[in-house]
Amino acid sequence: MNKRELYDSFEELEKQTKFTLSQIERIKAEMGKVIEKNAELEIENQHLREHLHEIEQKQKGNKEGTELSKSRKNLEKLYEEGFHVCNVDNMYGSRRVNDEPCVFCQDVIYGDRH
């Protein structure tokens, strides 16, 4: 190999090395963006999990508070069998016409429970 060929080979190697270095820098920049996005998503995911946990706890608390008492369950059963359980116009115990819903009965069963 003469000096000219050696010099040309060295220049070609230098070009390839510069190209490889530019690729490495580009990949490094992309990798930095991916790592940053991943960190953001992990934080967001953690916040969403905490929010979901709070919602589940509230729903669990609401379900415990919405359980009907034994007497209201009995009224609900009578209502489902087609009888009034409200005392509007002395209708308690009378048959509901065509089993139509009665908001007064529903209020007695499911209404405010303080």
From Swiss-Prot:
Its main location: cytoplasm. Keywords: Cytoplasm, DNA replication, DNA replication inhibitor, Metal-binding, Zinc. Binds 1 zinc ion per subunit. It is found in: Cytoplasm, Nucleoid. Homotetramer. Interacts with both DnaA and DnaN, acting as a bridge between these two proteins. One of its GO terms (cellular component) is nucleoid. It comes from the Bacteria. One of its GO terms (biological process) is DNA replication. Pfam families: YabA. Belongs to the YabA family. Disulfide bonds: none annotated. Its cofactor is Zn(2+). Transmembrane segments: none annotated. Involved in control of chromosome replication initiation. Inhibits the cooperative binding of DnaA to the oriC region, thus negatively regulating initiation of chromosome replication. Inhibits the ability of DnaA-ATP to form a helix on DNA; does not disassemble preformed DnaA-DNA helices. Decreases the residence time of DnaA on the chromosome at its binding sites (oriC, replication forks and promoter-binding sites). Tethers DnaA to the replication machinery via the DNA polymerase beta sliding clamp subunit (dnaN). It comes from Ligilactobacillus salivarius (strain UCC118). This is Replication initiation control protein YabA. Zn(2+) binds at H84, C86, C102, C105.
